[in-house]
Amino acid sequence: MFLRKENNELAIICRSPFQVLCAIEYLRSNIIEDYTFYLLSFSNDDKSEEISANVLGLYNIDYIVCRYPKLKDYFPLLKSELCNKYNYILCGNFFDAGQRMMASIIGSNRAVITFLDDGNQTINAIKQKSYYVTFDSVTNTLRSLFSGFLFIKKKCLLNNFFTFFEYEDLRVNIKKNDFSHVLINRNKINEKDGIYIIGTNSRSLNHFLDEKNSVELHLTRLIS
């Protein structure tokens, strides 16, 4: 159910630089030129928005900034020409209630929603039910319930993931992201001596670890 390259009814919703890179890889690997790129932001002073915009600039991609810090900011979309417009949507993060709410509004009946890679969050997302509810705040809870209602009403398809993780699950459709198109002709940086620390939500890795490695990971958490 992934997007066919000849279809031009595509919207992209992202909030972070990494999500932007995944979206660019999707566009290039599928040779898609007709789309609308929405950069979602919750404030006027958003560092993530600034970096994401710089990344899009490197690839000469036009984008529209959408600032929806409050729940009521989404309601004008319901009466706009964007409502029910797109048959296909790339959504940066399965767990982002704001992205899901926007996708549920601008998506058409039976719209195909493909979730882009958001690191270890993708592993958690694949395990979750399609209509995930975020309870970290009242606003996000309402966003989740509202988007879940629209997704069900419109019978949207929410089981597509574009990820670099190897994961076999009959409930979802997974397309491999190897970043091969994003990396083409990019300048390489020579390796330098030093220590590189990559932060991650280690709980998401438990699914891939055997008992011995899980214990080692737990001990690492305790002493770090």
Model-identified regions with their sequence ranges:
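Short boundary motifs at domain starts and secondary-structure transition points
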Residues: 1-5, 27-29, 78-81, 183-191
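Low-complexity, charge- and small-residue-enriched intrinsically disordered regions
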Residues: 4-6, 85, 152-153
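Nucleotide-activated donor-dependent transferases that construct or modify glycoconjugates
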Residues: 4-16, 197-200
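Nucleotide donor/acceptor-binding cores
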Residues: 7-8, 87, 193
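Active-site and donor-binding regions of nucleotide-sugar-utilizing enzymes
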Residues: 11-150
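Extended hydrophobic/Leu-rich segments
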Residues: 39, 82, 86-88, 112, ...
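A nucleotide-sugar donor-handling region in carbohydrate enzymes
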Residues: 117-118, 123-126, 130-204
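Conserved catalytic-core segment of nucleotide-activated headgroup transferases in glycan assembly
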Residues: 194-224
